[in-house]
């Protein structure tokens, strides 16, 4: 009798283990993530980082908006890495697809953390990114509400600037990109239970793409002569 009870208990535990939902991982990086050869051979570096995100999003699990003021953590819907690092890597991928002006390529450092601290030496140009909002909405329709502030900074090489400014980054351009709206259509290749999450992840990724395009345009069109000299490497 005791053995039967033990066997039943073991069967219940096994069934409970089988019912645990699997973890699903998402990334902001575009599918064709490999940087083109021209970008990798470019002589000048745009360092991506630091990238900061709201404290509430500083976790691997998804935080989803519910109603006007609520939020819910989805334990089994996860980013492939910390959100700040994923934003940094996605920014690198989008920038190195071609929108950067000639002679520049983007890098988030060997670890891809977006901190900029792991680069071998200070880059002449740096992109600081502050994610102000990164709202994921699943119902009634998958959507996002994003707000990202970006700042291009230049490390002057002009010795005439004096000891106060020497070795300090100066702001070239700063702006805020707002992106909100319905997520793109469902991808039939994704299992049905995951389509809402996949749509939201792709919408967030599109926000990063728009920021990358804004940054590239600002680098191409800078009218500030000192900034222009820094960007062109003169």
Regions found by a protein language model. Give the residues of each.
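Short, highly charged C-terminal tails/helix-capping segments
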Residues: 217-234
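Soluble periplasmic/extracytoplasmic beta-strand elements of cell-envelope proteins
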Residues: 45-50, 63-65, 126-131, 145-151, ...
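C-terminal motif of bacterial Sec signal peptides marking the signal peptidase cleavage site
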Residues: 14-17
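Short secondary-structure boundary motifs at beta->alpha junctions and helix caps
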Residues: 70-77, 157-215
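N-terminal segment of the mature soluble domain
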Residues: 43-126, 214
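Sec-dependent signal peptide recognition
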Residues: 3-9
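Surface-exposed short loop/turn segments
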Residues: 19-36, 98-160
């Amino acid at each position: 009798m005791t053995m039967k009870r033990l066997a039943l208990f073991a069967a219940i535990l096994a069934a409970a283990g089988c019912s645990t939902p699997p973890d699903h991982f998402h990334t902001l990086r575009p599918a064709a993530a490999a940087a083109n050869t021209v970008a990798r051979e470019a002589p000048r570096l745009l360092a991506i980082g630091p990238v900061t995100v709201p404290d509430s999003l500083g976790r691997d699990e998804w935080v989803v908006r519910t109603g006007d003021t609520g939020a819910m953590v989805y334990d089994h819907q996860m980013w492939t890495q910390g959100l700040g690092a994923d934003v940094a890597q996605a920014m690198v991928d989008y920038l190195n697809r071609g929108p950067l002006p000639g002679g520049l390529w983007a890098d988030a450092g060997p670890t891809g953390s977006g901190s900029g601290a792991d680069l071998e030496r200070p880059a002449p140009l740096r992109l600081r990114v502050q994610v102000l909002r990164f709202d994921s909405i699943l119902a009634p329709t998958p959507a996002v509400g994003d707000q990202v502030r970006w700042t291009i900074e230049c490390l002057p090489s002009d010795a005439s600037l004096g000891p106060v400014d020497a070795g300090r980054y100066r702001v070239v351009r700063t702006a805020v990109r707002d992106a909100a709206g319905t997520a793109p259509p469902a991808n039939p290749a994704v299992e049905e239970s995951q389509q809402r999450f996949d749509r939201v992840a792709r919408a967030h990724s599109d926000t990063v793409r728009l920021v990358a395009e804004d940054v590239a345009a600002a680098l191409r069109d800078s009218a500030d002569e000192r900034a222009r000299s820094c960007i062109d490497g003169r």
